[in-house]
Regions:
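Zn-dependent metallo-beta-lactamase
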Residues: 2-46, 53-55, 142, 146, ...
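Beta-strand-turn-beta hairpins that frame and shape the catalytic cleft
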Residues: 24-27, 41-47, 129-140, 177-184, ...
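Extracytoplasmic
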Residues: 32-34, 42, 68, 125, ...
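Active-site neighborhood of phospho(di)ester-bond hydrolases with catalytic His/Asp-centered motifs
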Residues: 48-50, 70-78, 98-101, 184-188, ...
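Active-site environment of divalent metal-dependent phosphoester hydrolases
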Residues: 55-56, 80-84, 104-107, 126-130, ...
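Binuclear metal-ion centers of metallo-dependent hydrolases, dominated by the metallo-beta-lactamase
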Residues: 97, 109-133, 224, 228-277
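Active-site-proximal loop/helix segments of hydrolase catalytic cores
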Residues: 159-228
């Protein structure tokens, strides 16, 4: 009788999601290069962040063709290396656009993002939280110290009568909380800023995806200070080495973290790699 009861209880635990750790699905992270990531959640949902999949450092030149399910596309700001192929992917997959309202509006009106896939349900602003039920996740928009402009596809020099770049609202970073999985902080393009100290007041970040390239964003030394303030369990460098101006390196970042006593928090990925979280 006892053996029979144990079997029944064990089956019930698995059915109701209370089974052993090995029965749970992990969160999968894929890095395409620059600031572009794919996140597959334990529920089977798929998020893309800043989907420049054709970034030169991505070894897989068929990444867009290989995409299957995509539920949401998160874009941090309007620069081309972050919008990437978002519109093409949205038309292919039906993915909804998560972005600040100003950026969301201009991606629809200027770039042709499908209207029904970019609504108030997934548009927001700094401090707001957006539920992503298809992916079993929620995302909070946080500040990023950067710019955000959309360049129309037909842009020419303003002096020649062409369109100028269009302001696209405030740039943001995203804190992504995954049901049954980790909390990630994608910084977007940013410098270090004082309000990063507020992030650990509200979130326990498991993995911080931090830009380190410099010139347009914080460099390795400034990024190390950002990590000290955010207090993630782990940090992965991104947005470096895509072209010459992004000269910051993971080795420099590791050294700067080590000087602050937190060098063991850094993990590395190469473009095209996957990691279970």
């Amino acid at each position: 009788m006892n053996q029979w009861l144990c079997k029944v209880l064990g089956l019930a635990l698995l059915v109701f999601g209370l089974g052993p750790v090995w029965a749970q699905k992990s969160t999968q992270l894929h890095w395409y290069g620059q600031a572009a990531f794919k996140i597959e959640t334990p529920s089977g949902g798929v998020l893309l962040i800043d989907p420049w999949l054709n970034v030169p450092t991505n070894p897989d030149k068929q990444s867009i063709d290989k995409l299957g399910r995509v539920d949401y596309i998160l874009v941090t700001h309007g620069h081309r290396d972050h919008i990437g192929e978002a519109v093409e992917i949205a038309k292919k997959t039906g993915a909804e656009l998560v972005a600040p309202y100003g950026l969301q509006f201009n991606m629809k009106s200027v770039l042709g993002y499908p209207e029904k896939q970019a609504t108030g349900a997934t548009g927001g602003n700094i401090g707001g939280q957006i539920m992503l039920p298809k992916a079993g996740a929620k995302v909070t928009l946080v500040h990023a110290a950067h710019g955000s402009d959309i360049t129309p596809p037909t842009i020419a020099e303003p002096a020649a009568g062409g369109l100028a770049a269009i302001h696209a609202g405030n740039p943001v970073g995203y804190v992504i909380q995954i049901d049954g999985g980790p909390t990630l902080y994608h910084t977007g393009d940013t410098d270090v800023y004082q309000d990063m100290k507020l992030i650990p007041e509200f979130f326990k970040v498991d993995l911080m995806l931090a830009c380190i390239g410099g010139h347009f964003t914080m460099d390795p030394k400034r990024a190390a200070l950002a990590v000290e303030w955010v207090q993630p369990k782990q940090v992965m460098p991104m947005h470096f080495g895509t072209y010459g101006l992004l000269a910051g390196t993971p080795a420099q970042f590791k050294a700067a973290l080590t000087q602050r006593g937190i060098g063991d928090r850094m993990i590395e990925m190469k473009p095209g790699e996957d990691r279970a979280l």
